[in-house]
């Protein structure tokens, strides 16, 4: 079944379509500030399962999400596209790009997305941790869980005001739907993608906030063009949208 999505035509002669995938807790609006500065492309903003207009849809694993993504592209007759994804959306984008059934894919841009844990014990431990987070979404007020979520080390660069803004923004999500998606797409259930990513025949660019030490280190292991976003942490497109838009325009123009 297709996911809920929102199509926006280019404001100039279209060079193609960009498909935007948000992170966990986000929705189709997450990329719109950046996309507004990319005037030469059509845009398709997707709500992933358990989020936004797709909150009523669930997924069981990465392959299922990929099927839903392909169905969405087909429903909008998207024949050629660049795929841009942040965090969870980046992991889904990388999975999609490496499955072989992507004749229309013209390029891949990932911001702060993990290519996959190589060690089985690490994957098992991460899945256990994500199941615990999922249970918290079931059991506790969503504001309490979000406050704890945004205090994880990867979000250490957030100020108190930025953290509270995100909590307020994300509190409208459906906790049960989030819990289901969190378990289905945990890095603990994600296959390592390093080898298939290295064999991609389309351009692959990685964006990362310069203050995001963890994902800067991960990006260095991919051997792909790395674009550091000034003054930003893990959520670079939110913290410095102008720089991300400038970077994307340079990548997307042939």
From Swiss-Prot:
Pathway: Quinol/quinone metabolism; 1,4-dihydroxy-2-naphthoate biosynthesis; 1,4-dihydroxy-2-naphthoate from chorismate: step 3/7; Quinol/quinone metabolism; menaquinone biosynthesis. It holds the Pfam family Abhydrolase_6. It comes from the Bacteria. One of its GO terms (biological process) is menaquinone biosynthetic process. It is an enzyme of class 4 (lyase). GO terms for molecular function: 2-succinyl-6-hydroxy-2,4-cyclohexadiene-1-carboxylate synthase activity. InterPro entries: AB_hydrolase_1, AB_hydrolase_fold, SHCHC_synthase_MenH. Keywords: Lyase, Menaquinone biosynthesis. It catalyses: 5-enolpyruvoyl-6-hydroxy-2-succinyl-cyclohex-3-ene-1-carboxylate = (1R,6R)-6-hydroxy-2-succinyl-cyclohexa-2,4-diene-1-carboxylate + pyruvate. Belongs to the AB hydrolase superfamily. MenH family. NCBIfam families: menH_SHCHC, PRK11126.1. Monomer. Catalyzes a proton abstraction reaction that results in 2,5-elimination of pyruvate from 2-succinyl-5-enolpyruvyl-6-hydroxy-3-cyclohexene-1-carboxylate (SEPHCHC) and the formation of 2-succinyl-6-hydroxy-2,4-cyclohexadiene-1-carboxylate (SHCHC). This is 2-succinyl-6-hydroxy-2,4-cyclohexadiene-1-carboxylate synthase. The gene is menH.
């Amino acid at each position: 079944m297709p996911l809920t999505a929102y199509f926006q035509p280019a404001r100039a002669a279209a060079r193609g379509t960009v498909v935007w995938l948000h992170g966990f807790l986000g929705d189709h609006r997450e990329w719109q500030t950046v996309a507004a500065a990319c005037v030469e492309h059509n845009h398709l903003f997707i709500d992933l399962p358990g989020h936004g207009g797709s909150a009523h849809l669930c997924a069981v694993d990465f392959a299922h999400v990929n099927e839903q993504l392909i169905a969405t592209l087909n429903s909008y007759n998207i024949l050629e596209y660049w795929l841009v994804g942040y965090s969870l959306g980046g992991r889904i984008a990388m999975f999609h790009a490496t499955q072989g059934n992507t004749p229309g894919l013209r390029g891949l841009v990932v911001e702060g997305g993990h290519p996959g844990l190589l060690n089985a014990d690490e994957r098992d431990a991460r899945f256990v941790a994500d199941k615990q987070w999922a249970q918290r979404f079931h059991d506790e007020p969503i504001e309490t869980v979000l406050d704890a979520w945004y205090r994880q080390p990867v979000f250490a660069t957030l100020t108190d005001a930025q953290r509270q803004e995100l909590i307020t923004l994300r509190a409208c999500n459906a906790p049960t739907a989030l819990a289901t998606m969190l378990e289905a797409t945990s890095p603990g259930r994600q296959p390592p993608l390093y080898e298939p990513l290295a064999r991609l025949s389309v351009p692959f660019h990685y964006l990362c906030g310069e203050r995001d030490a963890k994902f800067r280190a991960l990006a260095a292991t991919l051997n792909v063009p790395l674009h550091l976003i000034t003054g930003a942490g893990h959520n670079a497109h939110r913290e410095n949208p102008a720089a991300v838009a400038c970077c994307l325009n340079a990548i997307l123009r042939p």
